[in-house]
């Protein structure tokens, strides 16, 4: 899972980089592994800054001063399979045709065939293990078919038809053609989110933004916004004070199935994705979870409800209200430690849990505690939290998950774990409780979770992580290749890759 952002300003003399930086901070929760930014200045010249680390560390004042131009894109990377190196920070760039930069959120599930096609048929060199580079080169190859001196909107839309035809998976992309435009597009199933917004300036001109979540748009006064539809694309001209953005339904919508895990965990609660309030869904999750708790544990056996900060707070508070039990903030969070399941290895995840959360003993001592978290993935965080609760004096610990049991790979951009590393893999709920060291584990049912999120327009979601049935299907050998690449990256973590990838356009990459 990643955060992507693109901004085109009407004032051609203005500098977009500071606003891209601010927007990146609003999307930092979507990717803490690497950050990158590319801008377009006069005569179509591109400028870039990217590297491993948080946005505030990568985008230093010295580097930002070199990012000129009124149009640009940004990316926050969450480490998926094949993307742990500094050289794999995005945006990616190809100089031919026309000079293209691309930021990609999601994962392609037919990478084996795409890599062969790019090598054997169109003879494009792929320099990294990232599927984002594959997607960019498929688009570049399709655009090159036109063999024209200058590109136009129809050429871009036709090239995107080729991308949709060849690329399978969940993806949302923001790209930039040097000196010409921004563009954005979304996969035909709407698995990954992408929103478009506009902001009216005092002189009547308009600025435009593309972003992964609505919270970025609202924070920057892009108050008129909407979701791109599945299979839809938009082109925003660089000189957007003279030309309007153009939208086109490039391919028909296959289905409208946003990833359910966005609402459970990944998105900020103050975002609205596909017309669905993340905060509202989490309130509903708390109500449904309370009903599931009652089926497993007598409420009289619970003295207090405790949340695991931060994502589970909304759900836990509502759960406590419906159980008529006191709610307590019994874990204090260190906000300078990243999300634990994003950590690159097990040892780091275990130590990170204790650095991240500190229990207040008096909230646990001699109490029977229901702990509510958004999900249980590997069980690393859950097990340590349960241990801390018992060390602090809890007499019984029940553990409730706002999500159903996760027993399968997430293949569309949230690199949770290999299937066999998931604590619920090949285990019953009682066996999970035994593994975690608590009295009972209570999972939300999938049916209830869907009910919490659905609307009149969207009543189905991508739920493969819970069921093993993926909306796009996967090519033969993909899951095995995914696990092979993960294992390879794990082995390479001790051997640093090249610090900077090859790129002649890196004028601002110091």
From Swiss-Prot:
This is Amidophosphoribosyltransferase. InterPro entries: GATase_2_dom, Ntn_hydrolases_N, PRibTrfase_dom, PRTase-like, PurF, PurF_N. Gene3D superfamilies: 3.40.50.2020, Glutamine Phosphoribosylpyrophosphate, subunit 1, domain 1. Mg(2+) binds at residues 373-374. SUPFAM superfamilies: N-terminal nucleophile aminohydrolases (Ntn hydrolases), PRTase-like. It comes from Lachancea kluyveri (Yeast). GO terms for biological process: 'de novo' IMP biosynthetic process; purine nucleobase biosynthetic process. Pathway: Purine metabolism; IMP biosynthesis via de novo pathway; N(1)-(5-phospho-D-ribosyl)glycinamide from 5-phospho-alpha-D-ribose 1-diphosphate: step 1/2. It catalyses: 5-phospho-beta-D-ribosylamine + L-glutamate + diphosphate = 5-phospho-alpha-D-ribose 1-diphosphate + L-glutamine + H2O. The active site is at residue 2.
């Amino acid at each position: 899972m990643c955060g992507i952002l693109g901004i085109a300003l009407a004032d051609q003399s203005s500098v977009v980089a500071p606003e891209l930086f601010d927007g990146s901070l609003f999307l930092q929760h979507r990717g803490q592994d690497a950050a990158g930014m590319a801008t377009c200045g006069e005569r179509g010249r591109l400028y870039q800054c990217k590297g491993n680390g948080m946005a505030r560390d990568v985008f230093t004042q010295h580097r930002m001063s070199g990012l000129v131009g009124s149009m640009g894109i940004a990316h926050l990377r969450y480490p998926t399979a094949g993307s742990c190196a500094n050289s794999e920070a995005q945006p990616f760039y190809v100089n031919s045709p026309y000079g293209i930069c691309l930021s990609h959120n999601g994962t392609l599930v037919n990478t084996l065939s795409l890599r062969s096609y790019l090598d054997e048929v169109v003879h494009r060199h792929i320099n990294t293990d990232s599927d984002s580079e594959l997607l960019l080169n498929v688009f570049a190859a399709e655009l090159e078919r036109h063999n024209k001196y200058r590109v136009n909107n129809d050429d871009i839309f036709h090239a995107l038809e080729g991308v949709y035809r060849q690329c399978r998976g969940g993806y949302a992309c923001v790209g930039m053609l040097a000196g010409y435009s921004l563009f954005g597009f979304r996969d035909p199933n709407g698995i990954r989110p992408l929103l478009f917004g506009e902001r009216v300036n005092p002189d009547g001109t308009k600025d435009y933004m593309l972003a992964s979540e609505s919270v970025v748009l609202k924070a920057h006064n892009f108050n008129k916004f909407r979701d791109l539809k599945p299979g839809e694309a938009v082109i925003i001209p660089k000189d957007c004070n003279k030309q309007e953005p153009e939208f086109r339904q490039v391919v028909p919508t296959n289905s409208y199935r946003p990833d359910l895990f966005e609402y459970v965990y990944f998105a900020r609660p103050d975002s609205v994705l596909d017309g669905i309030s993340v905060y509202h869904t989490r309130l509903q999750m708390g109500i449904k979870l309370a009903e599931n708790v009652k089926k497993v544990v007598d409420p009289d056996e619970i003295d207090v409800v405790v949340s695991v900060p931060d994502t589970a707070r909304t759900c836990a508070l509502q759960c406590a209200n419906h159980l008529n039990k006191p709610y307590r903030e019994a874990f204090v969070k260190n906000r300078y430690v990243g999300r634990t399941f994003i950590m690159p290895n097990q040892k780091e995840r275990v130590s990170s849990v204790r650095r991240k959360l500190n229990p207040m003993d008096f909230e646990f001592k001699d109490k029977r505690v229901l702990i509510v978290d958004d999900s249980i993935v590997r069980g690393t965080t859950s097990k340590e939290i349960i241990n801390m609760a018992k060390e602090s004096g809890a007499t019984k610990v029940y553990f409730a998950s706002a999500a159903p049991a996760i027993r399968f790979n997430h293949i569309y951009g949230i690199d949770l774990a290999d299937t066999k590393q998931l604590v619920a893999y090949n285990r019953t709920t009682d066996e999970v409780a035994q593994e975690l060291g608590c009295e009972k584990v209570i999972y939300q049912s999938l049916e209830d979770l869907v009910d919490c999120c659905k609307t009149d327009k969207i009543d189905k979601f991508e739920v493969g992580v819970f069921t093993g049935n993926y909306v796009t299907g996967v090519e033969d050998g993909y899951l095995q290749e995914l696990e092979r690449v993960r294992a390879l990256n794990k082995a390479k973590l001790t051997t640093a890759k090249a610090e900077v990838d090859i790129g002649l356009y890196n004028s601002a990459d110091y």
